[in-house]
Amino acid sequence: VFCNTKKLAEEVALVLRNLGFNSLALHGDMEQKDRNKILVKFANKSLSILVATDVAARGLDIDSLDLVVNYHLSRDPEVHTHRIGRTGRAGNTGLACSLFHESEEYKIEILEKTLSQPIKRTLIDSVEKDFTPAQPDMTTLQIEGGKKQKIRPGDILGALTREDGIEAREVGKINISETSTFVAIKRHSLKKALEVLNNGKIKGKNFRARKI
């Protein structure tokens, strides 16, 4: 979900969380380490909805998104094109939609000229209130060790799938930074994965692991 201001990004993310959605905001006022954690969670599918400003989303490197929503229309047609280009990549299917008021019709007309194609308008009469938000299948663990400690993805997978551990299919994307490692784990295997990591060793050493 794209917003034009940091304040609105925070507010929209909060409203979505209050409705039961797994949602976080991403904007330039956040510390880099916090932005990195959120981007990792979104990329490894342990975060369902990312509400971001354009500047903050520049580091988003995902092959394709199922849905892109413009909560605000971008002031720049090129930025709009870049936003919606994040869905339906490489032959995948995806949906991009924009929320706008009738007073912004002229902006839609500008976008149609820029994109050289018509944009379908749909009037929203009401919003379905009787729903249960889906939760992501994955969750993310952070291990306090990374490249500096010469940790590799195979070391993490081996530690998690040892005899008393979890199955390899329960482990998702593994991201290793200089001093931390982020691992996507199936939500139902979270407790066991934490137990295995915190009571075991990686490369012969103890490393603390926690859910983020």
Question: Model-predicted segments: where are they?
Answer:
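Conserved helicase RecA-like core
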Residues: 1-212
